[in-house]
Amino acid sequence: MKKFFALLLALVMSLSLVACGGGDDATTDDTTDDATNEETGGETTNDYKISVVLKTLSSEYWGYVKAGCDAAAAELGVEVSVVGPGAESDIEGQVAQIEQQIGAGCDAIICAPNDAGAAANALQAALDHGIPVLSVDTDVGIEGQTTFVGTSNVDAAYEGGKWAIGQAGDGAKAVIIYGQEGDNTSNMRREGYQKACDEAGVKVLATLSGQNTTDGATKTMEDMLSAHPGEIDIVLCHNDDTAIGAMNACKNAGVSDVIIVGFDGNASAVDLILAGDLIKATVAQQPYEMGYQAVEAAVEVLNGGTVESVINAPVEVVTAENGQAYLDNLASMQG
């Protein structure tokens, strides 16, 4: 593969020299591009192609990330291609998409990996050929990547867990429904929830995977309710789809005295919170902003600039008290 790219690069360079009439003209073209970028205050005038490979496009949360990417592309005048497999569990499908995007040609690639190790192996081809690699939401952690745009999942889950424990009071018992096995984000959120419980002396009755889906979480919650009847006070969930699955299981079992906490800040979850349903809070990331900032960072680097190695995205615990304000702000960002 490396030999193929080397031959292709040599061919392109030789054709460019013929078209430009020699090395002096080629140098002039490079200078003109730099000058144009300076005249526009850092905004690109090049036809940059930026590929974005998300965990999936089949969820509300990742739709927000895509919307942020698209908004940045429109504002900065670049072409962005956003893809993702049908489910977050489809690791091989995502790897294939990464390889397809690199093979099709891109100036930078942004990835939210379903499996960091598998994604890193595929993204190495981009780094080997000088293509900037950026992570969004979940850190690929590959040596040489440009930046990670995202949330400290440990700290964010810790805040969500602390809020739930404060609402439940002394003697509460909890369960944790985490996401995909082996996923870095899932591991970090589970760690944050566990930390909050440990510090408060809250017993964690069970920690099981909900497979990042509503149906998977429903089945997991049913198993937890069967194993610990009448004992569960708090359900700490990997994301809002998981929280909705847990809520469905509780309703089916006639359980109403439970505090369910989601994660992501999806509008569908906030609507349930405001309606007084079993989901009482969601740890809201800023997915739209993360998508926007990732594309913005890619353009900055392509224009010859530099960015921080980590671009932190803020979080807040959304409850019935601040839910409507959160929804209003979310709507305003999406136009």
What positions do the PLM features span?
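Sec-dependent N-terminal signal peptides of Gram-positive bacterial secreted proteins and lipoproteins
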Residues: 2-23
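A residue-level marker of the well-folded mature domains of exported/periplasmic proteins
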Residues: 17-335
